[in-house]
């Protein structure tokens, strides 16, 4: 029974582990199929591929932060070419938007709380390949202003209005397909820390996402119980969508989510249930 995790983050975005550490964790946890899905960047994929042992199947991926009509969502791209021009053009635009958001948050913290970052801290923030509020939260925790990232974001960052810096979902799906990849709706009932939507709320959104070109659903997820998973698997089957699954592992930056955890019970899920892996590895 092969163990898989198709939703993993490194410090190329907002994960705490570098690639070498991540590979060690993957090996120690006996994972045999993995995907690197950093937020809005593909930069780690080539290096990760070179570090992964040969007995582990590595899938190059990305997680794009999107809006599809009025649906705020994350779209995973699997089996992508990280050098694809259309995908990289989109990602480069995203980097500029993230820097604008970063500047807004820095100014907000200064004006609202009198918090000013040192030159070294600012240099570190601006050097991130895909800067997110987690990085700011890390600095606030180091200063002793909060006990963890969640507290730092809740108390200092979340109230800051930054405007919409999400990708247009249709363009994101197009870019993933242009890169030879498979677009999959990530944690479609709600992600880590989010309120899970009801089945009645989900179904109309699913129809919209299908019309925009998604080809799969992340049915197995670290925060989904068996009832939610079975519902999503049925929806995937009814709509001829591929099934994916992942932990959404971020290391210390999202505590309580071990790598390889694909349900709330943390029971082993055979990779054969993730139909997308068979398609990618045997296509």
What name fits each language-model region?
Residues 249-283:
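Catalytic core of soluble alpha/beta enzymes
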Residues 1-72, 155-162, 167-168, 173-254:
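An N-terminally biased module of ancient metal coordination in phosphate/nucleic-acid-related enzymes
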Residues 22-25, 78-80, 94-98, 236-238, ...:
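Short, low-complexity, polar/charged sequence segments that are solvent-exposed and flexible
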Residues 51-204, 208, 269-281:
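Extended substrate/RNA-proximal surfaces in nucleic-acid metabolism proteins
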